[in-house]
Amino acid sequence: AGCLSVSALNYLDKDEIKDKNIVCILSGGNNDIMRYPEILEKNLIYLGLKHYYIIEFSQKPKELKKFIINVLGENDDITRFEYIKKTNKNYGNVLVGLETKYNLELEEKLRENNFNFKKIDENDLIYSYLV
C-alpha cells in the first residue's frame, strides 16, 4: 500500500542517508477505507501484539472467569471469542484473538492454569479459514 515506502525508511541506516535526498512514492490507489482494519490487524500481528489461539475450555461454571482472572494481564484485550464447535459435553474449543505485549508470559499462564491451547498464525492452513 502507499505506506510501504515510508515504512521502509525505518530500515535504512541513518548515517548512510544523512545529507541525501530521499524520495518516497505514495500511491495507495489499490486501497480504500474498508481495508484499513485489515491493514491495522496485519500490522499488530507483525509487531507481535496480536495473537490467535484455539483454547480448550472445560464446560463448567466459571471457566471463562478463571481464564480472564488467571491468564489475562492488566493490558491484555480479547478481540475475538468464538466457539468453533460443540461436539463434546466436557470441553469446547474456542477461537480467541488477543492483543497483548507479553505473548510468552500469556502462554506460560495458560499452561499453569491447565488450558490446552494451540497458537495459530498465518502459516497454519486453518488460519485463513478461522481468521
Describe the role of every protein-language-model region.
Residues 3, 29-30:
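Gly/Ser/Thr-rich helix-start
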Residues 18-22, 49-50:
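Short coil/turn connectors at secondary-structure junctions
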Residues 9, 30-31:
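Thiamine diphosphate
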Residues 33-131:
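A conserved regulatory-domain signal marking ACT and ACT-like small-molecule sensing domains
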Residues 1-18:
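Active-site-adjacent helical/loop segments in soluble small-molecule enzymes
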Residues 24-27:
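Short beta-strand segments
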